[in-house]
Structure formats: C-alpha cells, structure tokens
Regions:
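Outer-membrane beta-barrel architecture
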Residues: 1, 59-61, 76, 100-104, ...
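Short loop/turn motifs that connect adjacent beta-strands in outer-membrane beta-barrel proteins
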Residues: 4-12, 65-74, 104-106
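Membrane-embedded beta-strand positions of outer-membrane beta-barrel proteins
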Residues: 12-16, 75-77, 103, 112-114, ...
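Transmembrane beta-strands of outer-membrane beta-barrel pores
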Residues: 16-22, 62-66, 79-85, 107-109, ...
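Extracellular loop and loop/strand-boundary signature of outer-membrane beta-barrel proteins
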Residues: 42-48, 85-90, 121-125
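Short sequence motifs at beta-strands and strand-loop junctions characteristic
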Residues: 46-54, 93-95, 127-129
Length: 141
C-alpha cells in the first residue's frame, strides 16, 4: 500500500481477446494447425484450432519519479492467460500462462528497460520450454 501511494502514477490495464471462426469443420472431420512439435494426433485430439478461443492479460505498472535524484523508475507486472480454445495464429492457447516482470529507468534523455517473462507448461504450447529476457536502451536527441 505504501508503494502505491508514493508512486507518481499507477496504471492497471486489462485486455480480453477472442477469436471466433464461424465455419470451422468439426475436429472429427478435419483438423487445422497444430504445431509439428506434437506430431500427428488422432481425430478429435486437443491442440488443433478451435472455433472459439479467448484469453486475457492483466498489467500493473507504476512510475516513481526522483527515486535517486532525477532518475525515475517504472516497475511492471504482466500476467497472460489463454483460458479456452486454440486460435489460428497461436496467440491464444488453452491453459497457457505467462508472467512478466519488468523495470524501466529514465534519466533526462536516456532510458532503459529490463524485463523477464516466463511461461508455464501448457500441453500444446510451443514456448513452454523457454523464458525471455529483454534489455533495451533509448537515447532521445
């Protein structure tokens, strides 16, 4: 509570995404797009594109000005969850979850961002065996 009160601003963001494919044949008749990592499955198996898929993403981000002199810090937390179904572009995968932690720093014209994302072990996820670390810097002139 104290951290949020001392923040210059705090942003809470919720995004909900879905995909509906109206004329997708039943999986007993024809299946579409399961990643080749999982091989050819039996008819009716999971992991193939479904007619409906949805998920959500929650983000919390706060800005703390003048933390050390004129340096501002911006920590962030992002959670993503594929709730149901498999989208045609792999953006929504049932039971796939990720957690991202980040911190940004800005000083005059220089800024830097460091973030780390980890994924759970959803059954048909192609990213469940990896994590993601990112560092970027920017100088405005």
């Amino acid at each position: 509570r104290v951290l949020f009160r001392s923040a210059q601003k705090t942003i809470v963001s919720t995004q909900i995404g879905s995909e509906f494919i109206s004329d997708l044949p039943d999986q007993e008749d024809m299946r579409f797009r399961r990643h080749t990592n999982f091989g050819v499955g039996e008819l009716g198996e999971d992991g193939y594109v479904t007619d409906f898929s949805w998920g959500y993403q929650l983000t919390l981000k706060s800005t703390y000005a003048n933390v050390i002199g004129p340096v501002a810090l911006t920590p962030s937390l992002t959670m993503k969850h594929g709730v149901e179904g498999y989208s045609s572009d792999d953006a929504l995968q049932e039971d796939e979850r990720s957690l991202g932690l980040g911190v940004g720093m800005s000083y005059k014209k220089l800024s830097a961002d460091l973030s780390y994302t980890t994924y759970n072990d959803a059954k048909y996820s192609v990213v469940n065996d990896r994590d993601y670390l990112s560092l970027s810097t920017t100088y405005n002139f």
